[in-house]
């Protein structure tokens, strides 16, 4: 897809996680999307491969690629096989923009052997109809789009953050913002 795309990172630093994934209702100055992923390859009902990693937007002048496109490029070039079923799970700091949502939906329509679940910390420009339509297009392709809850943040902390064995420390407002965002997502998907 795009030869300039970097390979995924293994993890991110704690400060990056707390800044980028905090589920604020209004998240000013968070201009990047971070995407943590797991990929399970399944053959004959057994998990045959397991990949994890982290992508972020590449905003240099050569690639200018959103995190979702970085993942798709890497996945298509290095992982995807027509003889394997895949369960892919994303944990994202922002929900996809309309262009990325459309590209992911088109990819899934062409690859029925790939199932995708997206857990997102925040909804990107959820008040605009085209962003809502992007999320609906993903849902129509069978993608489960969910808002990250405490357990999802904790999972990310334990699996995608250089945490030095420190426990996840939830921030004030996590549960309240989760409920507000979950309701807003439900409204957007109708």
Curated annotation (Swiss-Prot):
The protein's name: DNA dC->dU-editing enzyme APOBEC-3C
Catalytic activity: a 2'-deoxycytidine in single-stranded DNA + H2O + H(+) = a 2'-deoxyuridine in single-stranded DNA + NH4(+)
Pfam families, alphabetized: NAD2
Top-level taxon: Eukaryota
Annotated stretches, region: (Microbial infection) Required for interaction with human foamy virus protein Bet: 40-86
InterPro entries: APOBEC/CMP_deaminase_Zn-bd, APOBEC_Cyt_Deaminase, CMP_dCMP_dom, Cytidine_deaminase-like
Keywords, sorted A to Z: Antiviral defense, Cytoplasm, Host-virus interaction, Hydrolase, Immunity, Innate immunity, Metal-binding, Nucleus, Zinc
Organism, as annotated: Homo sapiens
Impact noted for substituting residue 109 to K: Resistant to HIV-1 Vif
UniProt activity-regulation remark: (Microbial infection) Antiviral activity is neutralized by the HIV-1 virion infectivity factor (Vif), that prevents its incorporation into progeny HIV-1 virions by both inhibiting its translation and/or by inducing its ubiquitination and subsequent degradation by the 26S proteasome.
Active site: 68 (proton donor)
Tissue: Expressed in spleen, testes, peripherical blood lymphocytes, heart, thymus, prostate and ovary.
Enzyme class: hydrolase
